Amino acid sequence: QKEVGTNCTWNINHNMRIQTTELDGVLLITPPVMHEDFRGTNTEVYNDAVYRQNGINYNWVLDSISTSRRHVLRGLHGDSHTTKLITCLHGSFYFVVVNNDPTHPQYRQWESFTLSDKNRLQVLVPPKFGNGHLVMSESVVFSYKLNAYYDRDSQFTIKWNDPEFNIWWPIRRPILSERDSAG
């Protein structure tokens, strides 16, 4: 870090933290706060060179932003070929990733994380994994990067409370779309 004034620092080293998780291929990433002072922070959410230096080599083709309100549960969605990078920009949500590859030894195993604008965590979700989120704050804004365009034919939906997956959610009666209710 470099001092640039009273109560003001710049992180010029791009100190990104990458952690493996219990699920093969799923990564938990903490991007660096580049600048912090009495006005707030500036976080570098994505820097292609830094991600590539850390072995995250994807050609992202689509960035989307999603908003939801408290107790909305979206998911669990996925497909056979897309990698996603999920980032919470405002609020907080309970995020679940589940292995949906029947040929993999971790099939039906899942892991959860809390993503928020405070902890800055990102989750890298590989192909053949479903993911879903439950909004815990009043509202949430999150972004996701995709390395492939939407392909309806390769999509799958896992019912949020499917007993075969036995996923724990913090509430029992979330707000669901028709698609997510049906699974």
Q: Language-model features: where?
A:
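Acidic, Ala/Val/Gly-enriched low-complexity intrinsically disordered segments
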Residues: 3-4
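Non-catalytic, conserved peripheral segments adjacent to functional cores
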Residues: 15-118, 139, 146-183
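Conserved metal-binding segment of the jelly-roll/cupin
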Residues: 115-138
